[in-house]
C-alpha cells in the first residue's frame, strides 16, 4: 500500500469514527464500526458488557488475529464527552 493510500484510508476511518454516536456510556456506535472493520480484516471480535450496581453498563470490544505469537495488545477508549450546543459549531461531524 502506498503512503497516499494509507493516508486516504486513515482519513476515511477517522471521518467515520467522528460520525459515530459515542458519548459515554453510549459508545456502541464506534464499537460497532470498529468491529465490522476488524472482522473484514480477518480478526475475531467479541463484545462484552461490564456492569456495576451503581453505574451504567459499559460495552467493550475485544479483537484477536490468530493465536501464535508474537502478541501485541492495544487498549483505548472510543467514548467522548458531549458536544455541547451544536449551534456553536462551525461544522458538524
Language-model features, listed with the residues they occupy:
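Acidic/His- and Gly-rich active-site-bordering loop/insert found
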Residues: 2-93
Amino acid at each position: 500500500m502506498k503512503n497516499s493510500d494509507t493516508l486516504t484510508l486513515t482519513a476515511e476511518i477517522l471521518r467515520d469514527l467522528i460520525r459515530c454516536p459515542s458519548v459515554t456510556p453510549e459508545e456502541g456506535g464506534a464499537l460497532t464500526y470498529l468491529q465490522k472493520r476488524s472482522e473484514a480484516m480477518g480478526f475475531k471480535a467479541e463484545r462484552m458488557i461490564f456492569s456495576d450496581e451503581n453505574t451504567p453498563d459499559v460495552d467493550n470490544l475485544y479483537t484477536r488475529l490468530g493465536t501464535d505469537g508474537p502478541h501485541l495488545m492495544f487498549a483505548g477508549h472510543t467514548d467522548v464527552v458531549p458536544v455541547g450546543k451544536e449551534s456553536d459549531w462551525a461544522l458538524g461531524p
